[in-house]
Amino acid sequence: MYRQSPVRKKGAQGEACATGRNPTDRGKAGSKRHLLTDGRGVPLAVVLSGANRHDMKKLAQLLDAVVVEKPDPKQLEQHLCLDRGYDYSSCRQEAETRGYIPHIPKKDAPIPAPTDSFRHPPRRWVVEVGHSWFNRFRRLLIRWEKQPERYLGFIQLAACLILYRKLLRGSS
């Protein structure tokens, strides 16, 4: 008979400790980093949740967690590129209410062949690069901290170091 571990019993389905059953790791408790980056992969916002949470449920919290000041949408349009997992009317509405122009491909639409006619081709690799930069920090690769505040603090420290390195590289 299957018994739940004490970690999963805390909070409403793992919200208190930002962990949840990981569907890809035999149901062990795990956490997920939701990451918002700019066009170069530099992190703008990070939110933690349980590994079993869908990304679209944390979109509003992620957009509210942006640490840089957004320019006025009337002067400079802000585009938000998301993948097919965010193809819900609530996600489009959340992005539009915060002044973003959402670019979300339809779930049932075929993937277009890459051509030169794209003005701004979709680039999912930008977020993946951001995640790989976080994974270079050994403290973040495996979550040892039990409290989500401490783990989020280490993630934010890593984001500061990533931004600092990007600024150093850009200024020379």
Language-model region placement:
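Basic, amphipathic alpha-helical segments enriched in Lys/Arg and hydrophobic/aromatic residues
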Residues: E94, R98, F118-S172
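Flexible domain-boundary/linker segments
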Residues: K57-K58, L76, P112, Q147, ...
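Short Gly/Pro-enriched loop/turn and capping motifs at secondary-structure junctions
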Residues: G85-Y88, D108-I111, S132, R139
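Polybasic low-complexity intrinsically disordered regions
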Residues: M1-K107, R119, A158
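Short, charged, surface-exposed secondary-structure boundary motifs
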Residues: I111-S117
